[in-house]
């Protein structure tokens, strides 16, 4: 731009942050970098100079609280008090009250904020707080509001709003309560920030990884495709105007002025600020521009499709790494996005509706056309709902105002009403957003006073769900009254001792519980702990004591245990510790007995011994002996080993002496014949069998003793040999021939009945007697081989607890008692105790009455079954009349005493006739007779002449569909839940917002509660069935119909008879992008009849959805990001297709390939008349796309390194080093910026090019260049670095095994013709 010496222009305006931005931007656009730097420098100097002179700082006097704050709060308090009164009178429900309170405070807060700003602007425009916040230097309006307005509503840890706002600001100071309430949100803010930075960083890393190889490689890809760009809106609001979205784009076709048909821009022209503004002024709604999404450049984006580089408002340079710029642009603002929004339940009306206020006082006229119906607002106010559009007229003094009322508006005035100025007339929904999505929510209502329930107009209905749970639901709404009274909870099993209508005084017994014993027995009192009422009472129903045996404590191996010694000298180990409980069948003690202990392992045979049938399935304790006899024991020593056979030092059948090393490190303890068991050259066991050895000559004898058998004393074993005692004869293979082994047999005698120490038992009734029984248990079965080197116990004698009665699960306590004659001696006693729990009398008792417990028995007393041990009484605390005992109902759990203070007596004029019936329910504020208004709500009682008694009561409004927790005439304590209100509230925006939403979009995750999408276009019909289920039928043009069942909790967003398109959402919720892509692809394939075009069109739709969704999240937080950055990322997510059937190409089903690659390959197939590949477009999340990139080095450095590298190695992949990351890893110059020029040629003459005759230099060019060398390559003398092999004349690229070296991408273009033409 030529500089002209013209007079400087003086602009007299406030320069704030926005103006500064504009100023520097303007300077940069017109004068370039150097001059802008000078201007910025001067501005900085100017700013600092004046900031220093002014000495701007915040002192406490700068925080000026507007004087009108007090009256604002007062009016809010008044409105809230009115709401509270309405609630107390039962005119509105708890939900409506809450909603009204929240909205009142929210509006007050906004109002106050406006006052604060106005106050500053009018009275003190140079206030430092005001200057800082409004110039954009520091702070914002919400922070100023907290400093000098009010802090406002806070949320609790669950994210619900607390209906008590912080009315003070930091200037006035907070109370302790307010301080604590603030800390919830403060803590949440800190935690969120910490998490956010990590999440945001990881998002940026994934974005960089997916787009790092997108570099501007060519000037123009020559595509005719493009995207339509229009302004981004949300209802009426324009989020991004079209001029802003067009800036720096290149037009795809000529732009014409709709009114004059003048050409505003040619095709292929880049749009600067002036042109963008002219297009917007001309009223053009959409313009077709080039976009990275439709660019046809291979593996990159071309200059024209990308447009301006936003850094310097010029066309982007060649070799610019636009992918990384895009990733950083999207990732950087990540930290500014809030993690979660508070889920408040429809805050402020201001967001979703416009309020119409009366400009002047006047009278309302609703025209003839007005069609309205009564409607209850969410604040419980009666209003009218407009059913059609009409005009509302306000006639004031000398002027007439007309308001357009849209269908769905809420009107707060009636025809003919007189209104004051600024009164709210109506709430008009913001157009485009009339269908606000709602969700079901519930709220519990607890009672504020104890008393008796009465239903008024409520019709309860019982509903049983599939699980058989019954809920009572209010079919019709109404009032639920709680009539005051003192409610006593009765203890389980308590019986009332009074009747309805009885008069009771303080201390009278209302109910009592008797504690009885079930079995009877001897009473034993616990320690007296000083409390007269509460002592542990135990009743011993049966006991057994070993009266002659003593118990001694013995220490062995540092541990103490008890031993029982009987008169007969037997010693038992006490297995159950004193103080523990044992059940029937449990072992209490075990005889210390060495008679049945063996020296080694061996073979066990029973002779005459019988064991109980029960114990056959080897019990843990062993087998119980039912009949005595003899055990025959044939000893043998068994070594179980697991070693190599080479370590064996003896042979099978060899005779060894005791102490021989049979296997390395294993010595035998007995003398005998060795028997070795081995398996696959691994030794399993070595058995040494002691006994007398005789050589056998006769094979028949050997066969006779093959299995082994018992030979009695005096019996002939074989001719010439007679057994002298009982032996076990067994034939073995010796080292030199067959041998007969006579093994000694030990005989162990078992008595039929083992001895039992004497015991003395006592029991209260024949039903329960217990005793100790001695049981002999064998550890092993008949014929069992015990493999062991050490000895084992064959038989154990145990004392077991037994009871006469069938009840197996009796538990007895083990106690040690000092003997009555000699206190030093301890005796073992087992007792069965029935515990009787007597109540502690605690003041803060749930019965909320005074309970009093007294014992009726003494220590040591014998009691019969059913005798009363103790008695607990509930005593009256305040005199009154008993009510609320429901006759004939199941056990009475509560009773009510109506006290004096639960009633009010009103004096009426004796003459005044009253229409009131006794028992009628009266709301506070009702006129009873002329001039007398009920001071409290209540139930009318005894009406004497001139007097009216009211029993105080509290009404609660119950809305229809609420869940009732109480019954009519039931009794409730204060704080009990009465009812669960079910209501609908507006969903606050998108529940998932900010980072999680962006992540969900870019990772292409399936949303949690996805909407239902129409698969085909048609007309929708909605059918409602009885159980709240909805069925949508879409009838297509040719009459076919598709059914879409809608689950509960999925709100519809279409109306009956509406025409729907393919892929349109039928219910509320985010769409699943994968389903959408599939629906579009199927639809367009049918419409267009061609796979490639259908894939492009379906991908284009999904791309547009993703770009707009990501944009809207950033916009909602007030962050501006250029569309092209998001488009670059989305391009990487939507460039691949999945092969369904490879046809005659070299692609395999299930592989992911670039869409363009498949298209080229299919064209080649079409030329040669072969079968093309069938494919489906896929949407990859950024992580998946990064792992599926062409470069395995880049993918491996991102995630799943081992898997990526193994797969690459198995597939024999080559990495052509096209991106930045792979070059950085290998240590080459990156192909961007100056390095791009050095690589440019190698990247353009790609292996994808044709295989024309090539002449190679004999000297190998060095492919690795460094930064210094790269700078010397200019654009025009680029050298080709892709030739890294030299060939002699006539040679082709042949490897030894006759395979040609080509990569996947070139394979598709080979035309299946031999290339070697030299």
Swiss-Prot record:
Protein name: DNA-directed RNA polymerase subunit beta'
A biological process from GO: DNA-templated transcription
Family per record: Belongs to the RNA polymerase beta' chain family. RpoC2 subfamily.
Record text on cofactor binding: Binds 1 Zn(2+) ion per subunit.
Taxonomic source organism: Synechococcus sp. (strain ATCC 27144 / PCC 6301 / SAUG 1402/1) (Anacystis nidulans)
Catalytic activity entry: RNA(n) + a ribonucleoside 5'-triphosphate = RNA(n+1) + diphosphate
Top-level taxon of the source organism: Bacteria
Top EC category: transferase
Keywords tagged on the record: DNA-directed RNA polymerase, Metal-binding, Nucleotidyltransferase, Transcription, Transferase, Zinc
MF GO annotations: DNA binding; DNA-directed RNA polymerase activity; zinc ion binding
HAMAP family in the record: RNApol_bact_RpoC2
One protein family per Pfam: RNA_pol_Rpb1_5
Statement: the UniProt record of this protein carries the keyword Cell membrane: no
Annotated function: DNA-dependent RNA polymerase catalyzes the transcription of DNA into RNA using the four ribonucleoside triphosphates as substrates.
């Amino acid at each position: 731009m030529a500089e002209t010496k013209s007079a400087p222009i003086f602009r007299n305006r406030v320069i704030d942050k926005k103006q500064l931005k504009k100023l520097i931007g303007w300077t940069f656009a017109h004068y370039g970098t150097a001059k802008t730097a000078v201007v910025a420098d001067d501005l900085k100097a100017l700013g600092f100079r004046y900031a220093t002179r002014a000495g701007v700082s915040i002192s406490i006097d700068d925080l000026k609280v507007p004087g009108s704050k007090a009256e604002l709060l007062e009016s809010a308090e008044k409105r809230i008090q009115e709401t509270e009164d309405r609630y107390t009178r039962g005119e509105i429900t708890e939900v409506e009250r809450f909603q009204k309170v929240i909205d009142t405070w929210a509006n007050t807060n906004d109002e106050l904020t406006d006052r604060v700003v106005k106050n500053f602007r009018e009275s003190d425009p140079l206030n430092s707080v005001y200057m800082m916040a409004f110039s954009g230097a520091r702070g914002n309006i919400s922070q100023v509001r907290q400093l000098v307005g009010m802090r406002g509503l806070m949320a609790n840890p669950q994210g619900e709003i607390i209906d008590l706002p912080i009315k003070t600001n930091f200037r006035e100071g907070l109370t302790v309560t307010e301080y604590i309430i603030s800390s919830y949100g403060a803590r949440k803010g800190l935690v969120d920030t910490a998490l956010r930075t990590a999440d945001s960083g990881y998002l940026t890393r994934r974005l960089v990884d997916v787009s790092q190889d997108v570099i501007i490689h060519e000037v123009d890809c020559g595509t005719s495709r493009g995207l339509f760009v229009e302004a981004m809106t949300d209802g009426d609001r324009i989020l991004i105007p079209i001029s802003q979205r067009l800036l720096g784009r290149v037009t795809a076709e000529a732009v014409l002025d709709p009114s004059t048909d003048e050409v505003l821009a040619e095709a292929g022209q880049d749009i600067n600020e002036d042109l963008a503004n002219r297009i917007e002024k001309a009223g053009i709604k959409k313009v077709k521009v080039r976009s990275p999404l439709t660019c046809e450049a291979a593996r990159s984006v071309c200059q024209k499709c990308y447009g301006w580089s936003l850094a310097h408002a010029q066309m982007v340079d060649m070799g610019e790494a636009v992918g990384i710029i895009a990733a950083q642009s999207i990732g950087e603002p990540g930290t500014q996005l809030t993690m979660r929004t508070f889920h408040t339940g429809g805050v402020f009306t201001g967001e979703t509706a416009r309020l119409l206020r009366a400009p002047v006082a006047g009278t309302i006229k609703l025209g003839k056309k007005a069609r309205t119906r009564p409607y209850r607002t969410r604040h419980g106010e009666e209003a009218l709902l407009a059913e059609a559009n009409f005009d509302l007229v306000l006639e004031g003094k000398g002027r007439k105002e007309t308001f357009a009322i849209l269908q769905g508006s809420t009107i707060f005035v009636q025809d003919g009403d007189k209104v004051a100025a600024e009164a709210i007339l109506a709430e008009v929904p913001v157009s485009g957003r009339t269908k606000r999505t709602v969700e079901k929510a519930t709220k519990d209502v607890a009672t504020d006073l104890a008393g008796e329930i009465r239903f008024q107009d409520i019709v309860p209905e019982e509903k049983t769900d599939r699980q058989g749970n019954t809920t009572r639901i209010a079919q019709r709404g109404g009032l639920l009254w709680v009539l005051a009274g003192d409610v006593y909870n009765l203890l389980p099993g308590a019986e009332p001792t009074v009747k309805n209508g009885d008069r009771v005084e303080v201390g009278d017994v209302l109910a009592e519980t008797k504690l009885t014993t079930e079995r009877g027995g001897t009473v034993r009192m616990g320690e007296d702990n000083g409390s007269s009422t509460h002592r542990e009472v135990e009743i011993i129903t049966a006991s057994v004591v070993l009266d002659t045996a003593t118990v001694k404590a013995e220490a062995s191996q540092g541990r103490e245990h008890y031993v029982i010694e009987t008169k007969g000298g037997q010693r038992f180990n006490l297995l159950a510790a004193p103080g523990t409980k044992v059940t029937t069948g449990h072992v209490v003690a075990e005889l210390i007995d060495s008679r049945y202990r063996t020296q080694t392992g061996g073979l066990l045979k029973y002779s005459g011994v019988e064991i109980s049938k029960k114990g056959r399935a080897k019990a843990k304790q062993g087998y119980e002996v039912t009949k005595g006899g003899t055990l025959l024991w044939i000893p043998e020593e068994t070594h179980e080993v697991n070693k190599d056979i080479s370590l064996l030092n003896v042979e099978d059948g060899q005779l060894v002496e005791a102490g021989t090393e049979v296997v390395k490190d294993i010595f035998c303890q007995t003398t005998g014949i060795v028997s070795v068991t081995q398996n696959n050259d691994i030794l399993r066991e070595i058995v040494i069998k002691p006994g007398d050895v005789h050589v056998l000559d006769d094979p028949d004898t050997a066969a006779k003793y093959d299995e082994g058998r018992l030979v009695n004393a005096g019996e002939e074993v074989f001719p010439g040999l007679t057994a002298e005692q009982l032996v076990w004869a067994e034939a073995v293979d010796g080292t030199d021939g067959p041998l007969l082994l006579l093994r000694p047999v030990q005989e162990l005698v078992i008595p039929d009945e083992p001895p039992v120490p004497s015991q003395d038992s006592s029991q209260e009734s024949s039903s329960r007697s217990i005793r100790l029984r001695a049981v002999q248990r064998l550890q092993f079965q008949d014929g069992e081989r015990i493999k062991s080197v050490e000895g084992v116990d064959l038989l154990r004698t145990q004392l077991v607890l037994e009871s006469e009665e069938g009840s197996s699960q009796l538990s007895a306590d083990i106690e040690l008692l000092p003997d009555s004659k000699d206190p030093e001696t301890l005796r073992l006693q087992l007792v069965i105790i029935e515990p009787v729990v007597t109540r502690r009398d605690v003041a803060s008792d749930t019965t909320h009455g005074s309970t009093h417990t007294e014992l009726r028995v003494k220590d040591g007393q014998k009691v019969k079954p059913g005798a009363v041990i103790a008695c607990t009484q509930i005593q009256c605390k305040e005199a009154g009349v008993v009510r609320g005992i429901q006759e004939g109902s199941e056990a009475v759990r509560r009773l009510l005493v109506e006290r004096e203070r639960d009633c009010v007596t009103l004096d009426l004029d004796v003459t005044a006739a009253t229409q009131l019936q006794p028992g009628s329910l009266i709301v506070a504020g009702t006129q009873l007779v002329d001039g007398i208004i009920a001071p409290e709500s209540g139930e009318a009682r005894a009406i004497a002449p001139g007097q009216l008694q009211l029993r105080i009561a509290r009404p609660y409004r119950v809305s229809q569909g609420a869940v009732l927790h109480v019954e009519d005439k039931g009794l409730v304590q204060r704080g009990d839940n009465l009812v669960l209100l079910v209501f609908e509230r507006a969903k606050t925006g998108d529940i998932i917002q900010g980072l999680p939403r962006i992540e969900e979009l870019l990772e292409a995750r399936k949303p949690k509660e996805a909407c239902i999408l129409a698969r085909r276009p048609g007309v929708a019909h909605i059918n409602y069935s009885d159980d709240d289920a909805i069925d949508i039928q879409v009838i297509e043009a040719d009459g076919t119909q598709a059914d879409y069942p809608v689950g509960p909790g999925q709100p519809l967003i279409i109306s009956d008879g509406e025409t729907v398109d393919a892929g349109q959402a039928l219910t509320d919720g985010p769409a699943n992008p994968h389903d959408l892509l599939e629906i579009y692809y199927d639809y367009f394939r049918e419409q267009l009849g061609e796979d490639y075009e259908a894939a492009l069109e379906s991908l284009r739709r999904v791309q547009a959805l993703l770009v707009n969704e990501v944009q809207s999240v950033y916009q909602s937080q007030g962050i501006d990001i250029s569309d092209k950055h998001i488009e670059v990322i989305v391009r990487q997510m939507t460039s691949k297709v999945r092969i369904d059937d490879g046809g005659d190409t070299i692609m395999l089903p299930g592989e992911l390939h670039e869409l363009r690659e498949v298209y080229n390959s299919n064209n080649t197939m079409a030329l040669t008349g072969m079968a093309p590949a069938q494919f489906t477009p896929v949407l990859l999340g950024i992580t998946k796309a990064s792992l599926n990139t062409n470069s395995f080095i880049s993918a491996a450095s991102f995630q799943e390194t081992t898997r990526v590298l193994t797969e690459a190695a198995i597939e024999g992949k080559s990495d052509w080093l096209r991106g930045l990351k792979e070059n950085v890893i290998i240590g080459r110059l990156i192909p961007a910026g100056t390095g791009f020029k050095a690589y440019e040629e190698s990247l353009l003459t790609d292996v994808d090019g044709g295989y024309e005759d090539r002449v190679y230099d004999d000297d190998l060019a060095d492919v690795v260049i460094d930064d210094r060398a790269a700078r010397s390559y200019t654009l025009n003398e680029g050298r080709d670095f892709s030739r890294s092999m030299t060939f002699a004349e006539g040679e082709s690229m042949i490897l030894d095994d006759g395979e040609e070296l080509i990569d996947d991408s070139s394979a598709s273009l080979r035309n299946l013709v031999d290339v070697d033409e030299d």
